[in-house]
Amino acid sequence: MVEAHSRATGTCSSLPDVADAWSRVSVVTVTHHSGRVIGACARSVAAAARVIVIDNASDDDSCAIVAELLPDALLIRNPVNGGFGAGCNQGFERVATEFALLLGPDSTIDGAALALLVAAADAYPGAGMLGPALVAADGHIEPSHDLGLFARMGAGKRLDTGLPPEGPLSADHLSGAVLLVRMSALRQVGGFDPAIFLYYEDDDLCLRMRAGGWSLVLVPEARASHIGGGSSRMNLRYHWKKYWHYGWSRLHIEAKYRGRGRAVGIALGVLARYAGKALANALSLKPAKAVRDAARFTGSAAWLLGLPAMPDLPDLRKR
C-alpha cells in the first residue's frame, strides 16, 4: 500500500478504451428530491453497461427523469428515505462488475475521465477507491482529498486547499461525490455504516478501507463536475435535518473509533455550547441560525440517550 499523501508509484500510461472502461463499471446513484440535477447526471452515464439508481422516497420528478433518460437502468423506489449510505449499499449489492462508480446525483463524469480512473485502478491494484478532481459549477477545483477524519480535526484546516497535484496521490480521505470503488475491496471491508443516516459515512468508509490494507488514490487528471446540494430542499426543515444528523453522526463516529467515554465528553460540551447559541440566536431573531443550533443540540442529545439516527425502517435490501 502506498504511504498516505505520498506520490503514488506506477503508471497510468496505458489508457483503456472508453467503451471498455464503461463495460467494467456499474454506476450507483442515490437520489432524494434530486429532480433539479439528476438529468445532467443521467445523461453523463448513458454509455454505462449498467446503471443502478436508488431513489429514497422522492416526491418530485426524480424517478420520471431517470426512467426517461435511462430506460434500461435498474430503478429502485424506496417508500421511505433510509439514508444515503443505506441506499448506496442497496446499489452495491446489485453490482456484478469489477468496479462500481458511486456518482452523486449532482455530479457528472465523461468517458475520458472514467477511463483515466479505470487505468489508475489497473495501475494500482492495491487501491480500494479512486477519486477524480472535482470541478465546481463556476469552474474552480473543489477540495476532493484530505487528511483522515481525526487528523483533519486536529489540524483545524483542510489539506487540499490549493491546486490538485500533478499526478496520482495516495490520500487518507476522498470525497464521496464521485468514487470509483473496487468491489473486491468493498466486499472485504463492508459497505457504508447502516447506522449513519447522513454525514461522516464517507469518512467511515475511508477509515475502514485503509484499516483493511487498501489505499485511496486521487487521480487529478480525471475531472468530474460537482454542482453540490442536489439532493435537498433549502428550507428550515432541511436545515434542521442536516444539523441534527451532523450532531448525531459526529458522536457516533467518535465513539466507534475512539471510545464512548471520549464521545460522551464531546457530547456534553456540544450540549452546553449549542443550547446557549440556540437561545441567543432565537432572541436575536435569527431563525436559520437558531434552528441550526437547536438541531445540533437535539441530534447530540439523541445520540447521548442512545437513540438511533432514524426510526426503525423496513428491510430495503431486497426491494
Feature roles, as predicted:
Residues 241-248, 260-319:
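Non-catalytic, C-terminal membrane-associated alpha-helical segments of glycosyltransferases
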Residues 29-47:
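Short, well-formed alpha-helical segments that are part of the catalytic scaffolds
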Residues 78-95:
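Glycine-rich, basic loop-to-helix element that forms the pyrophosphate-binding segment
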Residues 44, 55-64, 80:
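A conserved acidic beta->alpha catalytic loop
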